[in-house]
Amino acid sequence: MRGFTLPVWVVAAAKAAVKVLIGESWQSHEVIELLNNEESIVVPIRSASILDNGEKALGITNCDPGECLDLTRGLEIWVCLRYIENQQIISSDGLELEPWLKIIPGYGVGKFDLTNDISISEFARQLLIVNLKPYRKEGYSLNLEIIFPSGQELAEKTSNHAFGVVDGLALIGTQADVQESASPKKLQSTIHALRSRCAESSFTGSLIFVIGENGLDLALQYGIDSSKIIKTGNWLGPLLVAAAQEKVQQLLIFGYHGKLIKLAGGVFHTHHHLADNRLETLIAFAVKERIPLSLIKEFEEAVSIEAALSILENKDISTAKKLWKRLAVEIEKRSIDYVKRYETSSIEIGAVMFDRARKIRWAGNYALKQINSFGLKLEDY
């Protein structure tokens, strides 16, 4: 079954709302125009209605990512929309996409911590503009507030904080169709990209695996050479083996600590729906590091890896550093051992982890050697 990204469902709710606002009856489906002359799609609508004596309208959809394992499945999306006269003085809150279109992040929608601006991809921006442009009204701006009622709760299960996004889910997505990072098709396309990169005449035997779009964004911000980067999904194990088969000599895994800690526990498919051993792994290595039992018990009650890390850093920063250093070394060891199960190889695999504050914090021994050659250093508080 075909699934669509979050921006598509937001645009569908907005389009349903604006149509009832101008007096049309709501329909059970809306046609969404895509970018770059792609064929339009039909998206189901849950409901739409006018509010405040016809001054506003509300459109509601439920996100459906198709067969993809995604925490946005069933997410209820509200878009509240109204026309405001251009001469009218209004709040400066929100993002002006066009002189006639302003978007306001409501409850449960992610905002950048430093600027308070909505976290929205360029694809989502353009999709809103294309689909709402026919409803421009001379002398008025179209204001829409996006609300995800369960957005704050779901955001706690993501790495949004690692990229400076707070208060809810980011409105990201670079295309209409869901890219299934956990699917076999995605794995095969990534292996193909890896082999193509290794076949290039400029290939030097060194690669960097970055985990997801967010990992890629941060790696590029740090100035890491894009010609060495392969963006991966959740199938890390087979990709490590494929790298060894292509005679990669040095491989760096660059990712969020909440993802990579799974490798320290021997889990090489990192999607949270299929395996989530993070707190158990942290506790196991805390025992090996002889961390006091009272602290370990606090880990057990932590709601996330980040919360457990904060507990330890607040109590004993030096012990926290030792624990995460040990985890990074274990990730390297487990990764090399995984490869050797399937392939005879002398590949060196390094692991470097960043935290929710977008700081590179921890690295194993192989990783330290590699990042030093890039001119990067671990950051500390």
UniProtKB/Swiss-Prot annotation:
Keywords: Cobalamin biosynthesis, Methyltransferase, S-adenosyl-L-methionine, Transferase. GO terms for biological process: anaerobic cobalamin biosynthetic process; methylation. It holds the Pfam family CbiD. It catalyses: Co-precorrin-5B + S-adenosyl-L-methionine = Co-precorrin-6A + S-adenosyl-L-homocysteine. Its EC number is 2.1.1.195. GO terms for molecular function: cobalt-precorrin-5B C1-methyltransferase activity. Pathway: Cofactor biosynthesis; adenosylcobalamin biosynthesis; cob(II)yrinate a,c-diamide from sirohydrochlorin (anaerobic route): step 6/10. PANTHER family: COBALT-PRECORRIN-5B C(1)-METHYLTRANSFERASE. Belongs to the CbiD family. This is Cobalt-precorrin-5B C(1)-methyltransferase.
